[in-house]
Every structure is written in C-alpha cells, then in structure tokens.
UniProtKB/Swiss-Prot annotation:
Record-annotated Ig-like V-type domain positions: 35-141
Transmembrane regions: 423-443
The protein's name in its UniProt record: Cell adhesion molecule CEACAM2
Induction pattern: Levels in brain increase at fasting and decrease at 4 and 7 hours of refeeding.
UniProt modified residues of type Phosphotyrosine: 487, 514
Tissues/organs with expression: Isoform 2 is detected in elongating spermatids within the seminiferous epithelium (at protein level). Expressed in kidney, colon, uterus, gut mononuclear cells, crypt epithelia of intestinal tissues, and to a lesser extent, in spleen. Expressed in brain including VMH, globus pallidus, ventral pallidum, striatum, olfactory bulb and hippocampus. Also detected in rectal carcinoma cell line CMT93. Isoform 2 and isoform 3 are expressed in testis. Isoform 2 is detected in seminiferous tubule, not detected in epididymal spermatozoa.
Chain positions covered by the region annotation Disordered: 457-520
Residue ranges occupied by any Ig-like C2-type domain in the UniProt entry: 145-234, 239-319, 327-411
Organism field: Mus musculus
PTM sites of type Phosphoserine: 502
A biological process from GO: negative regulation of feeding behavior
Length: 520
C-alpha cells in the first residue's frame, strides 16, 4: 500500500471524503510555534461523518511513523504504519478499511461510528532512532431522532389531577439536553411546574384548562438538535355558568324569540331549556316564532357535564310588551300672565310607561319651580316666567316603543306693573343706601335750624326795651317824617308739648315782639 498524498489523489477515498478532507485541511491553520501537535477536526463528529487527525510541524528526518487506537503504541493497537526507507504503508491489526494515511502524517477516518470515539496516538522515529509520541482525540455522537412526548394521564380533571410529561428521544441519553416549551414559550420550574433531573420529565400540578398546550420537547447534543411533534393535553373541565344571548329581555308581540345558551366545558356540555320551570327543549338554541304576551316569563338554561358530573343554570326573564299609544297633551291656558301658574297634563292609557317632558324639541330641565305628579303625567310651573314660553310635548315610552304627544305652544304675557323682583339687587341696595344718607342729611339740617331758632329767641329776650323807656314818637329831626305811627304788641306764648303728669311743670315763656307800622 502506497502512502496517500496530502493533495488527496483521486480514487483513494470517496469523492465526498475528499471534499471534506480538503476543507478541513484548508480551514486549520498550524500553531504559531514549531512544536509538533495533533488536532482532530471536528472534535465532535456526528455518526457517519468523517474525522481527520491533523499533524502540525512533523519532525524532520522521520524514518517511520505509525497511528494507534488508544493511549498506547502497542503493535496490537496499531492502525497503520509508514516506513520512509521502503516508502511503504503497512496496515495494523485494528485497521478497519476506513482509515487513510497522508504523507504529512495526518490520518483520515471515514464514516465514523460510536466505537471510534476516543484517543489516537502517533509514534514518530527519526533516523537516529529517537521517538516522539503525540495523542489526539475526538467524540462521535449519534444524530438525534425526533423525540416523542408521553403522558401518564390522558384525561386529567381541572383542579384535581396532576400530569407528568416525558420526552423520549430514542437515542443514547448521554450528552442530551432537554428543553420544554408551551405555546412557543420556554418553560421553567415554578409554583405548579416541576422538572426532573436532566429535565426529561415535566410535571404539572393541579392542572387547569390553560395547561392544555401544545407542548414541545427539544433535544440537543453537540452535533444535532431535534424537536418533538406538538403534544396537547385533553383537560376535563366545566361547565362554567352558562350565558344566554342576546341580552334583550323585552320584546313586542309578533316578534320571534331566539335565545342561545353557551357554557365553557370539556367535553361539551348537554343543554336543556325550561320555560317557567317546565322542561321545554334539549338543545343549545331556543326559537319561538310570533310570540304574544303569554310568552312572558322565566327562561332557564340548564347545562351538564357528564364526565365531571357538574351542572350549572342561568335564568333570564323575558317580558312581552304591547307598544305604547300616542299620548295627548292638555293645558289649563295657553296664554298665561307672568308670575301666574300653569298646569300641563299628559293623557295616556299606558300607566306603566316612562314619562318624558319635551320643551322646544329638547329635554325639559325640571327646576325648583316645576313639580310633577301622578307618575309624571302632570307638570305644574309656578311661577311662570317669560323664558318658559315655548312649545311643550310629553313623550311616552316603554322598552319596545316610544310615542310623542301633540305640541302645545305656551305664551307668557308681560305684566306692566313694576315687579320689584325684576329689579337687580345691586340697584335696590344702592337706593337703600342713598335713602339712608338723605334722611340723615335732613335730620341734621332740622337739628341745626332748631338750634339757631333757640338762640334768636334768647337774644330778643335779653335786648328788648321796656315799655316805659321806649320812645314811641319819632324824632323831630328825622329825615323821613311820617304822619302817624301805630304800634302793636304781640304776645307769643311758647307752648310746651304735653308731658306726663308725673313730670314737673315748667313755666311758660312769654315773649313780646314789637312791630312798627308806618303810614305814608
């Protein structure tokens, strides 16, 4: 057997092995030092792939070198030997036919198996019979097959049971990593999630309907990754409290009654209908055409889960109402004097209907001056103001219909009589203050005048001449002579107001006023 060239002559190994080997040799760069080393590529190989043990910086002057399986140079473990002197390659006892030796000392092993995992030793001898022994190693791993998830409970009951899920990889479990996911999200240990050592088994405690899945188990080793098919749990639960739809509870005669009942349950619940507590139908839907007021009553949806043995009910009250009739509006007087009162009466045959008052096509805002009576049918406005003038209507409604009355226009006549209530409060206050000031001024002037009058009286009393000393005749040398002079004496008795008898009486003041009358 001749030594294979490092250039990999065609025909010595299969073409795919040549390509792989060439790529491996090209991808490996020798160590930066001149030290002889052995490296395996790849270090972790998938079963069936090729592995090459590359020798860097081969010794110069090598006379022979050989590869051995294991950490030994025993001839019993020899794979292949090359002797430079004879340029021959000699197969050893453990040669499998898959090994190829290259002139640079590298060893190619094709289609590796799990048994090929381990250490390989190269022994080199130079011309001076000096030996150099080096080792290299690699690991062979099985390509992972698709794993499968199994469960210890195929039909767990919500809130009662726990479930264990196991990931079966069908390959050697050594060097396998297990990862779990649910609905695409990774799972880790928590309050209700427990993982076994190595994560091969996932346990769910007290399962709920949200634990249904799907679950996926992912397996990994150094050479491959694989995923299981999605696995979902069939969790038994329910029924929940049923829901009856639609939400309408009022209908008018002649319409169709169509009810649907739904309750979350696994397996699906059984449905039963009762009308006024009497069994009617065993279906999820209830349909009654052309209903009348006789169809008013209680409608019950009864649901049952045969596996859990649980039952739930929901009751819905349905009322069939006749449409309301159009009301009529009356008023005591359509023309009202301002500040008077007015009463509007809504006449309706529908006593259980809702009353709504309309003012100028908008909702009437009920104020303090407005009162309603007889379930809102009578509206009284007292007192009425000019802003209350306008169009009034009443509206009658029930859950299935609405009617509006005729319109009445109310006129409010303005009262020409001054209404103090219409005067702004600021004006009233200003007038009151001005009046107080005016009265105070008048009182002050009266007091001042009275004081001056008393002073004048005192002056007259002190300076009046006596009757015996007064010259009654004019002076002869007076520039203006008068023919006759007449004098009169007026006595003024100052009258004091009546006082209580208990008060001491004061003397009356007597004053004499002289008046001169001249004749020309």
């Amino acid at each position: 057997m001749e030594l294979a060239s490092a250039h990999l002559h065609k025909g010595q190994v299969p073409w795919f092995g040549l390509l792989l080997t060439a790529s491996l040799l090209a991808s490996w760069s020798p160590p930066t030092t001149a030290q002889v080393t052995v490296m395996a590529f790849p270090l972790h190989a998938a079963e069936g792939n090729n592995v090459i043990l590359v020798v860097y910086n081969m010794m110069k002057g090598v006379s022979a070198f050989s590869w051995h399986k294991g950490s030994t140079t025993s001839t019993n473990a020899e794979i292949v030997r090359f002797v430079t002197g004879t340029n021959k390659t000699i197969k050893g006892p453990v040669h499998s036919g898959r090994e190829t030796l290259y002139s640079n000392g590298s060893l190619l092993i094709q289609r590796v198996t799990m048994k090929d995992t381990g250490v390989y030793t190269i022994e080199m001898t130079d011309q001076n019979y000096r030996r150099r022994v080096l080792t290299g190693q690699f690991h062979v791993h099985t390509l992972l097959l698709k794993s499968n998830i199994t469960s210890n409970n195929s039909n767990p009951v919500e809130g009662d049971d726990s479930v264990s899920l196991t990931c079966d990889s069908y390959t050697d479990p050594d060097n396998i990593t297990y990862l779990w996911s649910r609905n695409g999200e990774s799972l880790s240990e928590g309050d209700r999630l427990k993982l076994s050592e190595g994560n091969r088994t996932l346990t769910l405690l007290n399962v709920t309907r949200n634990d249904t899945g799907p679950y996926v188990c992912e397996t990994r080793n150094p050479v491959s990754v694989n995923r299981s098919d999605p696995f979902s749990l069939n969790i038994i639960y329910g029924p929940d409290t049923p829901i009856i739809s639609p939400s309408d509870i009022y209908l008018h005669p002649g319409s169709n009654l169509n009810l649907s009942c739904h309750a979350a349950s696994n397996p699906p619940a059984q449905y039963f209908w009762l009308i006024n507590e009497k069994p009617h139908a065993s279906s999820q839907e209830l349909f009654i055409p052309n209903i009348t007021t006789n169809n008013s009553g209680t409608y019950t949806c009864f649901v049952n889960n045969s596996v859990t043995g649980l039952s739930r009910t929901t009751v819905k009250n349905i009322t069939v109402l006749e449409p309301v009739t159009q009301p009529s509006l009356q008023v005591t007087n359509t023309t009202v004097k301002e500040l008077d009162s007015v009463t509007l009466t809504c006449l309706s045959k529908d006593r259980q209907a809702h009353i709504h008052w309309i003012f100028n096509n908008d909702t009437l805002l009920i104020t303090e001056k407005m009162t309603t009576s007889q379930a809102g049918l009578i509206l009284k406005i007292d007192p009425i103001k000019r802003e209350d003038a306008g169009e009034y209507q009443c509206e009658i409604s029930n859950p299935v219909s609405v009617k509006r009355s005729n319109s009445i226009k109310l006129e409010v006549i303005f009262d020409s009589t001054y209404d103090i209530s219409d005067v702004p409060i600021a004006v009233i206050i200003t007038g009151a203050v001005a009046g107080v000031i005016l009265i105070a001024g008048l009182a002050y002037r009266l007091c001042s005048r009275k004081s001056r009058w008393g002073s004048d009286q005192r002056d007259l009393t002190e300076h009046k001449p006596s009757a015996s000393n007064h010259n009654l005749a004019p002076s002869d040398n007076s520039p203006n002579k008068v023919d006759d002079v007449a004098y009169t004496v007026l006595n003024f008795n100052s009258q004091q107001p009546n006082r209580p008898t208990s008060a001491p009486s004061s003397p009356r003041a007597t004053e004499t006023v002289y008046s001169e009358v001249k004749k020309k």
